[in-house]
């Protein structure tokens, strides 16, 4: 739905009034075309400020439905306006109100692949298994549209993958297999769905994939299902047309559940002009040749009986909002008018959604974008035309011969080209193997139940897996398959044949090398990611170590300062002790003092006055102060080893000793 979303060019629209094209010659005043925005219109075109103003006023019913039965939340969910959906959900709107067809906002978001919106809705209590009037759940809608990531998201959210719709008895796996969505089928198989469930007609998902020509899905499902006896597939009573030995291999037209046909958001300006005829004075404008503006592509039928009554004429198929859609789709439609007008059953690729499933295509299903169904879906209408014509000539040959050269669509004014005479090709696998000299390998293919139709879909790796290991026969088979798919005549000379075979071999070798390079690139990305994680871990460890080192350095500096202070106090204590001892000796032994030489004066390092000038009480007090300072420093250096009471007791002991010495 991304190609139809107006998110890409929304700023260009905000400066323009809401008006519509009424055709050439319609005289409409500007005042008649200026329409005020209501809540539903603002939610549909992404006018966040208008919706915010309506919510803040609290005068409007945010769950009110318009004439079509849609609420503002439905429009925002369908088109993909995440911010508006979030705003409405915060305002408390109901998330399970259905449309007249029974479709909830979750179903509308799923049908368009809006994963973020689906996530918001589920967070607000949206019912995952709610069904519409057809019995389809949200998983059915995104499966039918081919939105791979939405299917994966719903499966991870707990959606029931084995639910069945009541009309045909289809399961989501059957819908994906019949539509040709390989990756979605792979998701279902990995999720563990039941592969042997049958619909009301008795067909399984594998049979439906085979019926509509999706052989890759058939091979994919065979690897996830038990091997059944050949008699079950060869029975003449049931599913005889599904036998792999049917060489004509017509691709039947898939009948889809019919939807109520009415005005859609994609109907274009003509439908809007019809329902707003009152703006022209209530009169229908006269019929004249009208040319739509740039961005609206119309299909004109050159055949009177082609698509008559299907409502395909003058129908816009591109969004005029996206300029890239205008340039691509309009030019392609002008170049291929014949194909668009005479669209029949279309040969569908098993990895994409194609143009349409049948003639009775609806306006919603025929133009719905499928950006995540396949990254290779951006091919133009011209390429799809060639594919359609080639496969039509290949598979609708009534005589079973090989196709002639690919037909070319006749454009207006061009002369018909002379058709080349067709040549007769092999009608079965034995004839083909005999022509290329590999008839001895027929038994190998018969053991694997491979006929001509399946043989033409094999690759070099498939042949090697079957048992064709010799290089020569394997190269002959791949070259024959390549020539058949290109609808080319066998070369008339050996040199041309060798050149064609060499080109085919080089292409296959390049494909193998590309696959290997992609795997190596993915492995290198993983290694780079691991190295980035390791680097982040190492950097965090280094930062922690650096922080720890800085803390230890600061502690060492603090300890060094304390040690220096303690050394100074210790020197002072020694000087004080020496002076005190000298005086005590003089006081107790005066006679000895006269006989012996006097003591040398103590070194008074750091003392403000000489120690000799202090009296004994003063000297004792100074000694007590220095002991107290020493205790404080030791406690700061080694906290917790000596309690305060012990230090006080130690200081008291020293003081008493000094007093006794003085006495």
UniProtKB/Swiss-Prot annotation:
Residues 500-575 form a coiled coil. CDD domains: SAM_ANKS3. GO terms for cellular component: cilium; cytoplasm. May be involved in vasopressin signaling in the kidney. Residues 1-421 are annotated as: Interaction with NEK7. It is found in: Cell projection, Cilium; Cytoplasm. Pfam families: Ank_2, Ank_4, SAM_1. Gene3D superfamilies: Ankyrin repeat-containing domain, Transcription Factor, Ets-1. The modification Phosphothreonine is found at residue 318. Residues 242-261, 278-425, 585-604, 637-663 are annotated as: Disordered. InterPro entries: ANKS3_SAM, Ankyrin_rpt, Ankyrin_rpt-contain_sf, SAM, SAM/pointed_sf. The gene is Anks3. Residues 424-487 form the SAM domain. Residues 378-395 have a biased composition (Basic residues). Residues 641-651 have a biased composition (Acidic residues). Hydroxylated at Asn-96, most probably by HIF1AN. It comes from Rattus norvegicus. SUPFAM superfamilies: Ankyrin repeat, SAM/Pointed domain. Residues 322-337, 654-663 have a biased composition (Basic and acidic residues). This is Ankyrin repeat and SAM domain-containing protein 3.
């Amino acid at each position: 739905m991304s190609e139809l979303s107006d998110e890409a060019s929304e700023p260009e629209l905000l400066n323009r009034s809401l008006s519509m094209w009424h055709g050439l010659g319609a005289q409409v005043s500007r005042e008649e075309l200026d329409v005020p925005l209501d809540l539903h219109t603002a939610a549909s075109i992404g006018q966040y400020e208008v919706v915010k103003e309506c919510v803040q006023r609290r005068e409007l019913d945010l769950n009110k439905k318009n004439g079509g039965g849609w609420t503002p939340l439905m429009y925002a969910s369908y088109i993909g306006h995440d911010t508006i959906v979030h705003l409405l959900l915060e305002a408390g709107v109901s998330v399970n109100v259905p449309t007249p067809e029974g479709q909830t906002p979750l179903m509308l978001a799923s049908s368009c692949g809006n994963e973020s919106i689906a996530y918001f809705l589920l967070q607000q209590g949206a019912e995952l298994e709610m069904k519409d009037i057809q019995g389809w759940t949200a998983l059915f809608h995104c499966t039918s549209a081919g939105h791979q990531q939405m299917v994966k998201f719903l499966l991870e959210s707990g959606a029931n993958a084995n639910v069945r719709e009541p009309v045909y008895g289809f399961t989501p796996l059957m819908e994906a297999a019949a539509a040709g969505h390989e990756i979605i089928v792979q998701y279902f198989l990995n999720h563990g769905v039941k592969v042997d469930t049958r619909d009301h007609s008795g067909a399984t998902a594998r049979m439906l994939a085979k019926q509509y020509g999706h052989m890759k899905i058939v091979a994919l499902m065979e690897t996830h299902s038990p091997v059944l006896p050949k008699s079950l597939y060869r029975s003449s009573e049931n599913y005889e047309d599904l036998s792999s030995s049917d060489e004509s291999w017509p691709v039947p037209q898939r009948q889809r559940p019919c939807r109520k046909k009415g005005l859609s958001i994609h109907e274009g300006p003509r439908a809007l002009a019809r329902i707003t005829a009152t703006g022209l004075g209530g009169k229908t404008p006269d019929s004249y040749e009208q040319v739509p503006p740039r961005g609206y592509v119309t299909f004109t039928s050159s055949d009177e009986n082609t698509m008559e009554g299907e409502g395909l004429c003058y129908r816009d198929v591109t969004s005029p909002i996206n300029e890239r859609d205008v340039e691509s789709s309009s030019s392609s439609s002008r170049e291929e008018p014949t194909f668009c007008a005479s669209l029949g059953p279309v040969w569908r690729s098993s990895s994409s959604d194609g143009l349409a499933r049948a003639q009775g295509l609806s306006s919603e299903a025929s133009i719905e974008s499928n950006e995540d169904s396949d990254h290779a879906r951006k091919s133009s209408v011209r390429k799809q035309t060639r594919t359609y014509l080639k496969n039509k000539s290949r598979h609708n040959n009534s005589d079973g011969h090989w196709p002639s050269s690919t037909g070319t669509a006749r454009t207006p004014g061009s002369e018909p080209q002379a058709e080349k005479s067709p040549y007769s090709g092999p009608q079965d696998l034995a004839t083909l193997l005999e022509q290329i000299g590999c008839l001895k390998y027929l038994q190998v293919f018969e053991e694997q139940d491979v006929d001509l139709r399946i043989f033409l879909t094999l690759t070099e790796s498939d042949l090697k897996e079957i048992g064709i290991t010799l290089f020569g026969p394997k190269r002959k088979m791949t070259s024959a398959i390549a020539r058949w798919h290109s609808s080319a005549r066998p070369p008339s000379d050996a040199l041309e044949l060798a050149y064609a075979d060499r080109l085919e071999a080089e292409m296959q070798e390049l494909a193998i090398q590309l696959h290997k390079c992609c795997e190596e690139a993915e492995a290198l990305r993983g290694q780079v990611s691991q190295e980035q994680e390791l680097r982040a871990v190492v950097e965090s460890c280094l930062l922690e170590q650096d922080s720890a080192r800085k803390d230890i350095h600061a502690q060492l500096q603090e300890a060094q300062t304390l040690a220096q202070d303690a050394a100074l106090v210790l020197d002072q204590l020694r000087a004080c002790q020496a002076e005190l001892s000298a005086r005590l000796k003089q006081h107790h032994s005066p006679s000895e003092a006269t006989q012996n030489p006097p003591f040398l004066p103590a070194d008074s390092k750091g003392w403000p006055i000489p120690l000799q000038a202090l009296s004994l009480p003063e000297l004792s007090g100074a000694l007590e102060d220095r002991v107290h300072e020493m205790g404080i420093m030791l406690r700061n250096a080694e906290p917790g080893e000596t309690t305060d009471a012990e230090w006080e007791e130690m200081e008291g002991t020293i003081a008493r000793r000094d007093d006794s010495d003085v006495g």
